[in-house]
């Protein structure tokens, strides 16, 4: 069996991205949280998957993909924790629907409701639990820089900031894939630069710290 461990739902119907744009705009305007998400039909999901991800998988002989929301669209650097909880739940629900519609081809990996300047705590833990228990997810994407290229939150070895999340991952026996999202730093193009920066920065932070020694089998 050939398993692609890194796939994203990049072909959601347009109302999905439009909702996030409206949500961020409303938050920036008056600080309120837009919670009413748009309807997405099974036919729209099927139209986004069958001629795109699924067709490419069949062409290349891929049997199964670990499938998560669009990474650059996680958008943790915009909004706040409350907006990002709504956005993560909506995004994860769409991925779960893909996995239910095509169970032989896709297994879900979740988006966490991280936010710039907010340590990952109960809101993140709640979505972690929901993803595992209700949606059947087998892993999650973990953004090492929710500030979107500013890198102003603590590094991954910071015990007060990150270790409680690592401990939850170990307790649930699920892995997290380190994956940055969008960039609001004009020096860093999101995909061409920020993604590479993120991987390298996270790798070195793990390599030069005692995370694996202190947490044990840290699932990252």
Stretch-by-stretch model annotation:
Residues 1-219:
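Helix-coil boundary/capping segments in enzymes
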């Amino acid at each position: 069996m050939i398993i692609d461990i890194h796939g994203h739902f990049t072909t959601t119907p347009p109302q999905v991205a439009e909702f996030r744009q409206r949500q961020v705009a409303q938050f920036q305007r008056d600080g309120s949280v837009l919670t009413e998400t748009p309807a997405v039909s099974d036919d729209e999901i099927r139209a986004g998957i069958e001629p795109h991800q699924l067709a490419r998988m069949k062409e290349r002989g891929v049997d199964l993909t670990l499938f998560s929301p669009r990474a650059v669209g996680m958008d943790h650097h915009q909004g706040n924790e409350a907006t990002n909880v709504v956005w993560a739940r909506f995004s994860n629900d769409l991925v779960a629907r893909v996995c239910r519609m095509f169970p032989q081809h896709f297994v879900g990996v979740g988006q966490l409701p991280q936010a710039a300047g907010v340590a990952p705590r109960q809101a993140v833990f709640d979505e972690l639990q929901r993803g595992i228990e209700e949606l059947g997810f087998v892993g999650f994407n973990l953004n090492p820089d929710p500030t979107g290229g500013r890198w102003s939150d603590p590094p991954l070895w910071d015990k007060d900031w990150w270790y409680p999340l690592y401990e939850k991952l170990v307790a649930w026996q699920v892995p997290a894939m380190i994956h940055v999202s969008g960039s609001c730093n004009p020096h860093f193009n999101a995909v061409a630069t920020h993604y590479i920066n993120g991987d390298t920065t996270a790798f070195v932070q793990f390599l030069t710290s005692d995370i694996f020694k202190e947490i044990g089998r840290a699932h990252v």
